């Protein structure tokens, strides 16, 4: 078996190894040889080479299977390849069971249940023990020299030598942990296209050693200037011990009224105490995160908020903070309500209104796609209308990140009425699902109903969703005769059940964008450059008297007081607070504005 430090990534087997409350992630080149495999695991778990261990892998049914022979190891790898899983999940226990069939010390059936325990994850590579870290300042990645900065735990830091790299770069570290880090010891990689130019930094290839760790220029947490800010602004972002002078807490806000509620969160209108600026705060209870995968959508939402914050048709982020029991996203307050509320008042919209809204939505979706993000939750409720009448997409918890040209994903998700046929078929999919959802939304705007109405169904509620999915997959969509030829044409284009033939779904997303812009529904009616600059007058201007006006929000929410229920100490005690390390975030551009007030 090749060393796990091999730099060749294609064909490596990812071993996700659970041992005594930790997850150690390592990589090995096939073929796996039993003795080498056990030696690798003992080293990763810091066990003596003569120590007996028991190794079990988890099959696709979630059952633990022992690995005691080369044949059993080969079978585990064969099953991994046939199931096309991304990793081999392994549990390691010290010693052997007293008798065959008996559990090992520390083994009980709950250890195999997903989400039953919290595991501290370590990525082992070249002797480095990397952990995901939310870095509070911009730090240069030792490999690609781009800056590790943003929302979420996108940075990896070695717990021993404190080497900092992007997650995507950690397998390109050539030097072993503890060795002097010099330029020749690093695999050359092209700097990322998003590198910040002219950042204040004295980083170089030289290194010095301080104490037991590595003191490299790339690891000094230099503040660098944000676009449009001054050096002074940037340098005051953090104080000497790394805590933020701009720290935000619940005490900074006065909660006014509830403006929305979903499956996972409540949204409250709030006033910033010192600036009197109005925001919306999305509040999520930590107790709902009882599965390891549940936390992922929060990290995704933060990451997409960061990408969206300066784009005109996407809701931006002010800050994030937490208490022992809750997470808080402070976001833009958009006073015109959402398209769902607007449609309830209007029943259906003129084609020119639908053309304007769908044009701005196309620009917003293309912006996300150009950054490798599938939105996956386009619906009337998630399209907000600002005070001038322009739209903003919101709610990024369903997004899928890191989609490059030709990449596909397979997660079954979305709002039932908007789910694309390829998702329902279990096919892998890409950006195509967003253009299908836009077709559904445009149909709703212009026809005043869903293209998949199942009103009058005799089935029980349990079967209604299955029947809806059957309709989406099989039934031909009937376009109302009242719609123009142009409108009918674009609906047929977006609602094509074959994603390879669907409007906007070219491998080159810019080519797909051109196809949409040049469709007869838009051609000659929209100046796309002016639209992106918000220089096209909206067809509807919501009557908003002030930033506190709630006229365009449903009274079932606004009549509710924004009270937070008292914390239950027993519930708090069961929450693993380390899962939320680094959740705090402050948009430096927002805080600079507040400082100037």
Curated annotation (Swiss-Prot):
The catalytic site is made up of: 377
UniProt region (Disordered), positions on chain:
192-238
Q: Which organism is it from?
A: Caenorhabditis elegans
Stretches assigned to the PB1 domain: 12-95
**EC number, UniProt record:** 2.7.11.13
Q: Which SUPFAM superfamilies match?
A: CAD & PB1 domains, Cysteine-rich domain, Protein kinase-like (PK-like)
Please quote what the entry notes about the protein's domains.
Answer: Residues 212-224 are capable of binding the PID domain of num-1 isoform a and isoform c.
Q: Which GO molecular-function terms appear in the entry?
A: ATP binding; diacylglycerol-dependent serine/threonine kinase activity; protein domain specific binding; protein serine kinase activity; protein serine/threonine kinase activity; zinc ion binding
Q: Which SMART domains match?
A: C1 (SM00109), PB1 (SM00666), S_TK_X (SM00133), S_TKc (SM00220)
**Matching InterPro entries:** AGC-kinase_C (IPR000961), Atypical_PKC (IPR034659), C1-like_sf (IPR046349), DAG/PE-bd (IPR020454), Kinase-like_dom_sf (IPR011009), PB1-like (IPR053793), PB1_aPKC (IPR034877), PB1_dom (IPR000270)
Q: Does the keyword Cytoplasm apply?
A: yes
On subunit structure and binding partners, the annotation says: Interaction with par-3 required for the peripheral localization of par-6 and to form a par-3/par-6/pkc-3 complex, which is activated when cdc-42 interacts with par-6. Binds avidly to the phosphotyrosine interaction domain (PID) of a novel pkc-3 adapter protein num-1, which enables tethering and targeting of pkc-3 to the cell periphery.
Which catalytic reaction applies to this protein? L-seryl-[protein] + ATP = O-phospho-L-seryl-[protein] + ADP + H(+); L-threonyl-[protein] + ATP = O-phospho-L-threonyl-[protein] + ADP + H(+)
Does the keyword Calcium feature in the UniProt annotation? no
Bias (Low complexity) occurs at 200-209
Tissue spec. comment: Abundantly expressed in the anterior and posterior pharyngeal bulbs, the pharyngeal-intestinal valve, vulval cells, and a region at the posterior end of the intestine that corresponds to site of co-assembly of the intestinal-rectal valve and anal sphincter, and depressor muscles. Modest expression apparent in four hypodermal cells that provide cuticle and muscle anchorage in the tail. Strong expression observed in discrete patches and spots in vulval cells and in somatic cells of the spermatheca.
Q: To which protein family does this belong?
A: Belongs to the protein kinase superfamily. AGC Ser/Thr protein kinase family. PKC subfamily.
Biological processes annotated in GO: antifungal innate immune response; cell differentiation; defense response to fungus; embryo development ending in birth or egg hatching; establishment of cell polarity; establishment or maintenance of cell polarity; gastrulation; gonad development
Q: Where is the composition biased (Polar residues)?
A: 227-238
Gene Ontology terms: cellular component: apical plasma membrane; cell cortex; cortical actin cytoskeleton; cytosol; membrane; plasma membrane
| Gene coding for it | pkc-3
Question: Phenotype upon knockout?
Answer: Worms show defects in embryogenesis. Mutant embryos show defects in their polarity and cleavage patterns which disrupt hatching. RNAi-mediated knockdown causes a complete loss of nlp-29 expression following fungal infection by D.coniospora or physical injury.
Q: What class of enzyme is it?
A: transferase
Q: Look up the domain of life of the source.
A: Eukaryota
The name under which this protein is listed is: Protein kinase C-like 3
What PANTHER family does the database record attribute to this sequence?
RIBOSOMAL PROTEIN S6 KINASE
The Swiss-Prot or TrEMBL record lists the needed cofactor(s) as: Mg(2+)
């Amino acid at each position: 078996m090749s060393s796990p430090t091999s730099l060749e990534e294609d064909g490596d087997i990812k071993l996700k190894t659970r041992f005594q409350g930790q997850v150690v992630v390592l990589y090995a080149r096939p073929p796996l040889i039993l003795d080498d495999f056990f030696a690798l695991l003992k080293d990763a778990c810091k066990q003596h080479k003569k120590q007996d261990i028991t190794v079990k892998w988890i099959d696709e049914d979630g059952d633990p299977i022992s690995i005691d022979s080369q044949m059993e190891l080969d079978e585990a790898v064969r099953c991994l390849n046939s199931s096309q899983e991304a990793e081999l999940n392994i549990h390691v226990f010290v010693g052997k069971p007293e008798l065959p069939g008996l559990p090992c010390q520390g083994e009980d059936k709950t250890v195999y249940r997903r989400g039953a325990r919290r595991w501290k994850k370590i990525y082992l590579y070249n002797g480095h023990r990397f952990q995901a870290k939310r870095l509070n300042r911009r730090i240069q990645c030792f490999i690609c020299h781009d800056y590790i900065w943003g929302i979420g735990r996108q940075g990896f830091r070695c717990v021993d030598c404190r080497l900092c790299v992007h997650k995507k770069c950690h397998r390109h570290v050539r030097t072993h942990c503890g060795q002097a880090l010099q330029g020749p010891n690093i695999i050359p990689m092209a700097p990322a296209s998003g590198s910040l130019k002219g950042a204040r930094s004295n980083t170089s290839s030289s290194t010095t050693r301080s104490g037991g760790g590595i003191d490299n220029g790339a690891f000094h947490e230099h503040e660098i200037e944000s676009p449009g800010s001054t050096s002074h602004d940037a340098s005051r972002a953090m104080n000497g011990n790394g805590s933020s002078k701009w720290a935000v807490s619940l005490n900074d806000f006065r909660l006014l009224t509830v403006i929305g509620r979903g499956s996972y969160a409540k949204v409250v209108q709030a006033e910033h105490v010192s600036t009197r600026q109005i925001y919306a705060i999305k509040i999520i209870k930590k107790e709902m995160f009882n599965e390891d995968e549940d936390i992922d959508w929060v990290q995704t939402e933060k990451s997409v908020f960061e990408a969206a914050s300066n784009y005109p048709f996407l809701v931006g982020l002010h800050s994030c903070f937490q208490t022992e029991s809750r997470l808080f996203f402070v976001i833009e307050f958009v006073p015109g309500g959402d398209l769902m509320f607007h449609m309830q008042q209007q029943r259906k919209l003129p084609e020119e209104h639908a053309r304007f809204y769908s044009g701005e939505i196309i620009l917003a979706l293309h912006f996300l796609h150009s950054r490798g993000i599938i939105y996956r939750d386009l619906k009337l409720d998630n399209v907000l209308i600002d005070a001038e009448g322009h739209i903003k997409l919101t709610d990024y918890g369903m997004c899928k990140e890191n989609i490059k040209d030709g990449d596909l994903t397979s997660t079954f998700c979305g709002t039932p009425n908007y789910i694309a046929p390829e998702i329902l078929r279990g096919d892998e999919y890409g950006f195509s699902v967003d253009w299908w959802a836009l077709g559904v939304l445009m149909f709703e705007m212009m026809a005043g109903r869903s293209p998949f109405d199942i009103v009058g169904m005799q089935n029980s509620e349990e079967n209604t969703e299955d029947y809806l999915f059957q309709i989406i997959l099989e039934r031909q969509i009937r376009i109302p005769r009242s719609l123009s030829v142009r409108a009918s044409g674009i609906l047929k284009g977006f609602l094509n059940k074959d994603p390879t033939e669907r409007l906007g779904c070219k491998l080159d997303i810019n080519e797909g964008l051109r196809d949409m812009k040049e469709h007869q529904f838009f051609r000659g009616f929209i100046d796309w450059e002016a639209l992106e600059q918000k220089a096209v007058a909206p067809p509807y201007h919501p009557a908003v008297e002030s930033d506190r006006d709630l006229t365009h929000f449903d009274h079932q929410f606004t009549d509710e007081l924004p009270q937070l229920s008292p914390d239950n100490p027993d519930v708090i005690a069961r929450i693993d607070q380390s899962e939320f390390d680094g959740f705090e975030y402050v948009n430096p551009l927002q805080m600079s504005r507040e400082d100037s007030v």
